[in-house]
């Protein structure tokens, strides 16, 4: 790949901020890089394909292939694979038969270990042992005597209650008077209108603009 493609070309516009970066028009081209990579890969593939074809068509390779086929190596490998598969099948069958035999022996052993049926003498002994004397009944607990009910208190009817009348000469004691504090007025801050920000000078007005100031649309050319 030519290194001259990485440098800007004379007479073409430059859109980058600094000379020599990849943003410049006419600088580094991704399309040329992709085409060069694809051409290199195609050349490597064609070279490998032609080399393999030449080796396959050579006389030495043909003789080696015929000798390999006549030696019977493939037949021996096939027979060995068949014997291996048959031996694995026999091993699996023997394993399954041994597991079934173990389960059968375990089931028969559990049946033999069960207790024999009870005889008449054993049944009679069990009945005699169960017919034991019951414990003597506990003494009867006397019933508790209910406590006497207290007499009901007759309530006073509301009509019979009379308020106490005080004599006119007797004064009523009153506490000191407490003056309640007057509520303070809550000062609500008035809404003041905000002052509009005024622009002072063209410099502050151009700060919010995008680009490089006044000349952000200008073009620079490579020389």
UniProtKB/Swiss-Prot annotation:
Keywords in alphabetical order, please: Capsid protein, Cytoplasmic inwards viral transport, Disulfide bond, Host cytoplasm, Host nucleus, Host-virus interaction, Late protein, Microtubular inwards viral transport, Phosphoprotein, Ubl conjugation, Viral capsid assembly, Viral penetration into host cytoplasm, Viral penetration via lysis of host organellar membrane, Viral release from host cell, Virion, Virus entry into host cell
Supply the name of the protein: Pre-protein VI
What species is this protein from?
A: Snake adenovirus serotype 1 (SnAdV-1)
**Superkingdom field:** Viruses
PTM summary: Ubiquitinated by Nedd4 following partial capsid disassembly; which might play a role in intracellular virus movement during entry.
So what family is this one in? Belongs to the adenoviridae protein VI family.
Q: Per the entry, what induces it?
A: Expressed in the late phase of the viral replicative cycle.
Q: Which GO terms describe its biological process?
A: lysis of host organelle involved in viral entry into host cell; microtubule-dependent intracellular transport of viral material towards nucleus; viral release from host cell
